[in-house]
Regions:
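Non-catalytic, polymerase-adjacent accessory regions of viral genome-replication enzymes
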Residues: 1-42, 383-387
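Active-site-proximal segment of RNA-dependent polymerases
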Residues: 2, 86-148
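Right-hand nucleic-acid polymerase module
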Residues: 74, 79, 83, 200-215, ...
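Short Gly/Ser/Thr- and Asp/Glu-enriched loop/turn motifs at secondary-structure junctions
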Residues: 55-57, 250-254, 286-287
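Conserved polymerase palm-domain catalytic core
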Residues: 121, 126-253, 258-272, 292
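A common structural junction motif
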Residues: 160, 274-282
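Conserved pre-motif C helix in the palm subdomain of viral-like polymerases
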Residues: 68-99, 211-241
Length: 387
């Protein structure tokens, strides 16, 4: 794979088809598609000529699974290029460097994969160690906001060709943060302090004059950022899996777990990880990072796990997930009363969510949520308004 594959017209076409998934209804996407062949030709020519530049990104806040995030999204024309670049260069170059148990944002992997691998490790650890073992669960603070560009680019320099590296460097450069409002002292220390994109968005635009920029942070809405987020701490993965030979280790984006028999050895590994995170500019969330006995309740990717004496696993959906869905049901009901959605639409939304979590051992809470849905929509259904 090379840059020729990136600006290949067929690959740009495929990039558009993937980039439009789920957003075909947007005006910008429809306008781009109305002149699709011409747009692909112009994009291809600009990349070949070296005149291609990204357009200004759109920023907005998104509440995802209870977390408010500042999202940066490229224009559709840039998403097409990035999709082709990621599929034909970035992923093929970086995927061989990743461990198998790094489970986010890649084909044939994802949330279910991360949970299945954790459950497999939990069972194997119980068979090998019994109940006399410990687990470290670790989380990073504002992970994407604090990925340092220079260190990220240094990693990619070893795996990308010169023209690929130059193209990727341009993508990363567009994510730098305007910090003109900082004093000279604050600016000199900004790389060593936790950056929060949500708080940065509250600062008046008049203070962001372009006088000072911070080479840190990647926008969550970009696929290149997602791939880079997986790759950035890969040396920690290699250290734990290869150097230390830890069998029961896994990572999902900024969440990590390690299962070991000896607590002191586990604490020593954690100390080494802290040092490596410090070198990378990654900040560990001390409140969410803990070492506990393997027999207690363990939370991983919003599922609560507990080992049974028989070696089986109890799996319960986290309470916050049910609270969030209850609020969503009430929102669906309000939209239904205003005529924005139909009863069948609300029902399909709920059934889709329910199908994801019915496999877990939370039957009682699911029944209560079923009753909540039926209670809110019963009157309208009985009145024949379900269509």
């Amino acid at each position: 794979m090379s840059m020729k594959d990136v600006y290949n017209a067929n690959n740009l076409w495929d990039g558009y088809l993937k980039a439009r998934e789920g957003v075909e209804w947007k005006e910008s996407v429809q306008k781009y598609e109305a002149n699709l062949l011409l747009n692909i030709y112009r994009t291809r020519k600009s990349i070949i000529d070296g005149t291609y530049t990204q357009k200004p990104m759109t920023e907005f806040k998104l509440c995802e699974r209870g977390h408010v995030r500042q999202i940066k999204v490229q224009q559709v024309s840039d998403r097409v290029v990035q999709r082709s670049f990621n599929d034909n260069v970035l992923i093929p170059r970086t995927r061989p460097k990743l461990i198998y148990d790094n489970g986010a944002s890649l084909k044939n992997k994802g949330l279910d994969f991360g949970r299945r691998r954790f459950e497999a490790h939990l069972r194997k650890a119980a068979r090998q160690y019994g109940t006399d073992a410990y687990i470290l669960t670790m989380d990073f603070t504002k992970y994407y906001d604090n990925i340092q560009h220079r260190k990220l680019l240094r990693m990619y320099r070893d795996v990308l060709e010169a023209d690929e590296y130059a193209f990727f460097k341009q993508i990363v450069h567009d994510f730098r943060i305007d910090v003109s409002y900082m004093t000279d002292e604050e600016y000199s220390n900004c790389m060593d302090v936790v950056f929060n994109a949500i708080e940065h968005a509250k600062i008046p635009e008049a203070l962001k004059t372009g006088a000072k920029y911070m080479d840190k942070s990647l926008g969550i809405g970009s696929q290149s950022s997602q791939i880079s987020g997986i790759y950035y701490p890969h040396r920690i993965d290699d250290y734990c899996k290869t150097v230390r030979g830890i069998k029961f280790y896994g990572r999902y984006m900024d969440d990590t777990y390690i299962i070991m028999r000896d607590k002191k050895e586990l604490m020593a590994v954690y100390s080494d990880i802290q040092s490596m995170c410090s070198e990378l500019g990654i900040f560990i969330n001390k409140k969410k990072t803990r070492i506990r006995h393997l027999t207690g309740w363990i939370t991983w990717l919003k599922i609560n796990y507990k080992l049974k004496p028989s070696g089986g696993i109890i799996r319960k959906v986290h309470s916050s997930t049910f609270r969030r869905e209850r609020r969503k049901i009430k929102q669906l009901h309000r939209l239904y009363l205003r005529g924005k959605i139909t009863y069948n639409h609300a029902l399909e939304c709920y059934k889709s969510w329910r199908g994801t979590y019915k496999r877990y051992d939370s039957g009682t809470k699911l029944k209560k949520l079923d009753e909540c849905f039926k209670k809110l929509f019963r009157e309208e259904k009985n009145n024949g308004r379900e269509k």
